[in-house]
């Protein structure tokens, strides 16, 4: 399980270290994919990506919608590894998609992490916090 918010700066080669607590889960590799409907990058441990892939295969959604979802997730995904220092290099297409410049936020989101440009994250975090309690109340049936 991933949680927490971590701030980093990209080095001159576009790399940043993943938080030490996250690295062991990513030792076998990770998949980077564009956030669906959000200007961020999703980072899944390989085992979680496989689970997602399998769950999508068994989903009963209209074929045309499923093709679109598969294109959005899989066609633009990258299989990457951390370097010996635990750093991650963001592929240029995903970096551009998420608008990542120098400062990045790594946010733990249960079974995956999200990578955001710092400025974009601040806006999203505020919006998420404002809606979180409303969502919890809905889940609790209040």
From Swiss-Prot:
GO terms for cellular component: cytoplasm; nucleoid. Keywords: Cytoplasm, DNA-binding, Repeat, Transcription, Transcription regulation. GO terms for molecular function: DNA-binding transcription factor activity; transcription cis-regulatory region binding. Residues 5-48, 77-120 form the SpoVT-AbrB domain. GO terms for biological process: negative regulation of DNA-templated transcription initiation. It is found in: Cytoplasm, Nucleoid. Forms oligomers. Belongs to the MraZ family. This is Transcriptional regulator MraZ. It comes from Dehalococcoides mccartyi (strain ATCC BAA-2266 / KCTC 15142 / 195). The gene is mraZ.
